[in-house]
Design a protein with these regions (language model features):
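Small/polar-residue-rich segments within soluble enzyme cores
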Residues: 1-131
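Conserved, well-ordered alpha-helix/loop/beta-strand core segments that scaffold catalytic motifs
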Residues: 18, 118-171
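Short, solvent-exposed loop/turn elements at domain surfaces
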Residues: 70-74, 144, 323
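Beta-lactam-recognizing serine transpeptidase/beta-lactamase-like catalytic domain environment
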Residues: 112-124, 128, 137, 167, ...
Length: 406
């Protein structure tokens, strides 16, 4: 038939290299072909190994999935024995540790006659299994983390905002790290998926569901998402303020109205709360916006201070760069004047391309152009917990403890 002819033509790379005509064949069909070789000359039915995921959806965004090797991957790994149709790690640990997990393919040498018919099997080299890769994930913690995420999303979707509309809550992410070495204890992104659907080739229906789902179950929000960290960033601003000389821990900043003005624009506490005289400890305890707005303003306007002091401290805690995790992640954005100019370039509707005091004020409370991933934020807080030691993250137990001091 045309379908079979097309498959043979697409995969044929040599006169004696087998062409895969079908997979996931029913067992009854497999047995029938084996029992009636005279009816199917040149056709062999064989059982192939297939990746199994006994934990199902658990830790799917860490584990990742395999899939049929792409043309680009085939070219890049030409010398490693890969063939069209082979499975290849596409995401997560499956991709990061492909070389360890794959093993080696088997080999069969055949003798053929002048007409290309097989006369005998000369030799057979059996395939070998790949290596085990031990992860740092605690399965129990991972399970609780994923269950809590799902419950949180469902609760949010059942909650109305100030306008009376239910929250959209398309997804969520959570990360648990060991602050002593940066290893990942749990990392979850919701919604998730079952990597088993990719093993042996994903069906069109399953692919349509996964790739077209508006809530993006394949997207790892924990590592690749970029979000404004909000008040969780205030500790970075506090460290910058003290380290760069913008404030002393015991200094009080007056807050008599719940707002400050920057270029005639009011910047206020949530619900315009008033906290009166506020030192650093109190500012962190009550999450005073006015206190941190003031620090952001000082960095931009006060003579003798490093105008990008907050940005520099943020980068020492890992914001704006990869965490080093093997499965890949987003660097995020620590904005400054150069970044804003790049955004404005070629965009006549962008507005003011200069870095203004208001930009720094927004940055000080984790807003504006600042974007971080949940993993970056967790790693920064692990750095706080370990006395300023910021490690590169890893999910593989054999990874080294790479760190720097913030």
């Amino acid at each position: 038939t045309d379908v079979l002819d097309n498959r043979v033509a697409a995969q044929r790379s040599g006169p004696f290299r087998p062409v895969e005509l079908a997979r996931d064949v029913p067992e009854a069909t497999l047995v029938y072909i084996k029992e009636h070789p005279d009816l199917f000359p040149g056709v062999e039915a064989e059982v192939r190994s297939e990746r199994s995921y006994p934990l199902g959806e658990l830790a799917a965004h860490i584990v990742g999935h395999v899939g049929e090797i792409t043309e680009e991957q085939l070219k890049a790994n030409k010398s490693k024995g890969y063939r069209p149709g082979d499975e290849f790690g596409q995401e997560g640990v499956e991709a990061a540790y492909e070389a360890d997990l794959r093993g080696t393919a088997g080999k069969r040498v055949l003798e053929v006659d002048a007409k290309g018919r097989v006369v005998r099997t000369v030799s057979v080299v059996p395939p070998t299994s790949g290596n085990d890769v031990q992860l740092t994930i605690d399965v129990d913690v991972q399970r609780v983390t994923e269950e809590s995420l799902a419950q949180g999303v469902f609760a949010a979707r059942a909650t109305k905002d100030r306008s009376g509309q239910f929250f959209r809550a398309p997804g969520a992410a959570a990360v648990v790290l060991d602050p002593d070495d940066g290893s990942v204890v749990a990392l979850a992104s919701y919604p998730t998926f079952d990597p088993a659907v990719f093993a042996g080739g994903i069906s069109e229906q399953a692919a349509d569901r996964l790739y077209n789902d508006a809530d993006r179950p394949l997207f790892n929000r924990a590592t690749d998402g970029g979000y404004a960290p909000g008040s969780t960033f205030k500790l970075i601003t506090a460290i910058a303020g003290v380290a760069k000389g913008a404030v002393r821990p015991t200094d009080s900043i007056a807050d008599g109205t719940g707002c400050i003005k920057v270029a005639k624009q009011p910047f206020c506490n949530a619900q315009k709360a008033i906290f009166y005289d506020t030192n650093l400890t109190k500012a962190l305890t009550v999450s005073s916006d006015v206190y941190f707005y003031t620090l952001g303003q000082r960095f931009d306007t006060q003579a003798g201070l490093d105008a990008y002091g907050i940005q520099k401290i943020a980068r020492t805690f890992g914001f704006g760069s990869s965490t080093g995790i093997e499965i890949g992640d987003s660097a995020g954005v620590v904005p400054d004047g150069d970044y804003k100019k790049k955004l404005a370039a070629g965009n006549p509707d962008f507005g003011d391309p200069g870095w203004r005091t208001g930009d720094n004020v927004n940055l000080a409370v984790g807003q504006g152009f600042l974007l971080v991933s949940p993993l970056q934020l967790a790693n920064a807080y692990a750095g706080f917990a370990s006395g300023g030691k910021v490690y590169e993250n890893h999910a593989g137990a054999q990874a080294g403890n790479r760190r720097h001091d913030a």
